[in-house]
């Protein structure tokens, strides 16, 4: 009989330094809490440092809080400049789902800038300091995505919140594919994996301020609270990547139907998310946009 996975599988992580982006709520908070409990030194990379300090005190253990706004490339560079010691594990967890099309201070479509281009630049800048593992939180939303390499910022095609989110997560999947390919080709000791946390109720953003949208949001929340993973369950696929001897480049999701909830398990991805030519083009695009290079 196979016992269900639990965070106790992490063992003793004392001496390990881990960066978790988006650590103040949702999956990032659940991830940080479990890692700190296992003895790791967790750096909470967050937009709101006041809330970050509050979360750090709640989490206990060995933690530090640092400012990071992934929608601002100057903030990404400033954060990377603060990291002067080796990092064992980098967890690119933070993400955005916006109500309308807006742009970052760098002129990127907000969803793409936060979910792909910020983490991409951060990883490139920190790569010389990473010793062991990079985990990128993707999503099964990639299964419904259309990839427009020539219009990833949705300047010419119609923008929709779910379309932009799905495309950004497909882009993360492709980046992860190419990152894994390069690390293995170089014989690097660093491994990388992708995860899908399931449907986590606390990560759902507001759907707008209109009465109709508020009503829709309440309906979604009511269903989500019944069907979704909680934040600890949502963190499990990420933690599973750390505790289990899974192959480099794996995609870890959840056991339940439709990828909604359940325990961590290795899952498949769409053919497009396995397209190495598309992945190489995606990485070249991200390098041009961020002015950083994936040097493996």
Question: Whereabouts are the PLM-identified features?
Answer:
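C-terminal amphipathic/interface module of NAD(P)-dependent oxidoreductases
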Residues: 270-296
């Amino acid at each position: 009989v196979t016992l269900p996975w639990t965070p106790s599988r992490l063992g003793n992580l004392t001496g390990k330094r881990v960066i978790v982006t988006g650590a103040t709520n949702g999956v990032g908070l659940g991830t940080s809490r479990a890692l700190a409990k296992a003895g790791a030194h967790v750096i909470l990379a967050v937009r709101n440092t006041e809330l970050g300090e509050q979360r750090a005190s709640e989490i206990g253990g060995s933690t530090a809080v640092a400012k990071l706004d992934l929608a601002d490339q100057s903030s990404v560079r400033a954060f990377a400049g603060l990291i002067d010691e080796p990092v064992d594990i980098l967890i690119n967890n933070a993400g955005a789902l916006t109500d309308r099309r807006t742009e970052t201070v760098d002129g990127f479509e907000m969803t793409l800038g936060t979910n792909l281009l910020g983490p991409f630049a951060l990883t490139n800048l920190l790569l010389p300091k990473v010793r062991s593992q990079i985990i990128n939180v993707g999503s099964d939303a990639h299964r419904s995505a259309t990839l427009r390499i020539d219009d990833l910022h949705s300047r010419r095609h119609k923008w929709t919140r779910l379309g932009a989110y799905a495309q950004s997560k497909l882009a993360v999947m492709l980046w992860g594919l190419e990152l894994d390919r390069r690390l293995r080709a170089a014989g690097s000791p660093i491994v990388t994996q992708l995860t899908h946390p399931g449907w986590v109720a606390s990560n759902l953003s507001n759907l707008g301020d209109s009465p109709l949208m508020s009503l829709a949001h309440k309906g979604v929340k009511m269903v989500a609270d019944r069907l979704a993973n909680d934040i600890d369950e949502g963190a499990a696929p990420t933690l599973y990547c750390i505790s289990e001897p899974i192959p480099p480049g794996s995609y870890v999701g959840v056991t339940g139907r439709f990828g909604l909830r359940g325990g961590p398990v290795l899952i498949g991805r769409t053919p497009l998310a396995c397209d190495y030519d598309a992945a190489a083009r995606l990485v070249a695009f991200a390098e041009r946009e961020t002015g950083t290079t994936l040097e493996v």
